[in-house]
Curated annotation (Swiss-Prot):
Keywords: Methylation, Ribonucleoprotein, Ribosomal protein, RNA-binding, rRNA-binding, tRNA-binding. Part of the 30S ribosomal subunit. Contacts proteins S8 and S17. May interact with IF1 in the 30S initiation complex. PANTHER family: 30S RIBOSOMAL PROTEIN S12 FAMILY MEMBER. This is Small ribosomal subunit protein uS12. It comes from the Bacteria. Pfam families: Ribosom_S12_S23. GO terms for biological process: translation. InterPro entries: NA-bd_OB-fold, Ribosomal_uS12, Ribosomal_uS12_bac. Transmembrane segments: none annotated. Residues 9-21 have a biased composition (Basic residues). With S4 and S5 plays an important role in translational accuracy.
Amino acid sequence: MPTIQQLIRKPRQPKVKRSKSQHLEQCPQKRGVCTRVYTTTPKKPNSAMRKVAKVRLTNGYEVISYIPGESHNLQEHSVVLIRGGRVKDLPGVRYHILRGVLDTQGVKDRKQRRSKYGAKRPK
């Protein structure tokens, strides 16, 4: 416990809150180019082949981002837009790719929650 005199000399420093998606640099989204598109397996209780992509952002950072929805058209050199948001059962995946933007197509035959997957309104 510091004395009052010590607190006058050197006041308390507020704790620095770090962003959970630092490589976006305070932007809501960032553009990038896919350098590798692959599947990976989730942590212990879950089992699947999750689709992820390694993306080089316009600011030079390289991040791993998740491709949501069923099937995708991404390959190497596809230009994508990413947003923050981690995938709980994939370690190191802290970003999501936005569907229906730039080179990424929306999910086909999607009826509900279409805006999250870039799907057009069905006729």
